[in-house]
C-alpha cells in the first residue's frame, strides 16, 4: 500500500512538473501536508446578514501556497476537497503591486443615478427593487470598504459591466484603451444623467389571462407566465449602465466592457504585471463565475482569490441571499480558493 501511494505521489509530482515545464514556468515542489484544525471558528462569519457562515465537520491547515518575494499582503484562503474529506486552509503572501482587485457587475440600478427597475413587472440585476436595495447595502457595507482599504496598495481596481462600448462611459471612466480628461468626465456625467433620467421605465404588465391545454396545463402555464421574462421597454438594455453609486470610484479605476471579451482583459492585466486577482462582485451563481471577468476565465491565467463575503448570489423565493451565497461559494471552492474580507491584511513587518 505504501509503495502504491509513493508511486502515485511520484507520478503526480512528475506530471505536475512536466506540465509546468511545457508551459515554460519555473517549477517547485509543494508539500501537501494536511494538519487537522481543532475547533476552528466558522468561515465567512463576519457578515452573517449577507452570507450564511460555513461550517464543515473537518478542517485542515496546509502549508503556504503563494509566497512571493517582497510580499506585503496576506491572503489566507480555503478550498474544499471531497477526496480529503474536508476544507483545506492555507496562508498566502502576495505582492500588492502584482495584484488587481476586480468587482464583477456593480450595476448602478435603483441607486439614484436614474437607471431603475421598470414597472409594473420589469426586471434587472437582482430582479426586484427590494432585492437591488439589499445588494446596494451589501456593496456599501462590505465591498466599498474593502476597495478603499486595498486601493492605495494594489496595482489595479477594476469593474466589469454589460452593454456596448458607448461614448458616454468611455469618457466617464478610465478604460483599457483610454483615460478621459476631467472635462470629458464632467461632460459624460451630464450625458449619463440625461440618458438615464429621460428614459421611460415601463414594462409589460403581468398576463391577466391566457390559454392552456387540457392535456398539459402545467407546461403551457409556465410557457406563458415565466418566472423571469423580458418585459422591459425596448431600449432599456441599450442604456449606458453605470458603476453603482454605492462604490466610491476613483479616476484610476478601470472599467471593463464585457462585450470586448476576456482576451483583452487578460492581456491588459499581464501587460500591467498582474499575477494575482482578488475577485468580488455579483452574482455568485452567474456573472461572478461565467462572464468576461468571472473566475472561470481569470483562473486560467492568474492566481485568483474569491472574496466569499464580498459577493452575493441571486436569491429567488427568499428574503435573504445568505443561503444561496453560501451554497454557490461552497460549490466554487471545489476548484477555487476562497478568502474573506477580514483575511486580506497587510503583512506585518
Place the predicted regions along the sequence by residue.
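Blade-loop segments of beta-propeller domains
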Residues: 133
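Sec-dependent N-terminal signal peptides
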Residues: 3-12
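Glycine-rich, aromatic-flanked loop segments that form ligand/cofactor-binding clefts
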Residues: 158-160
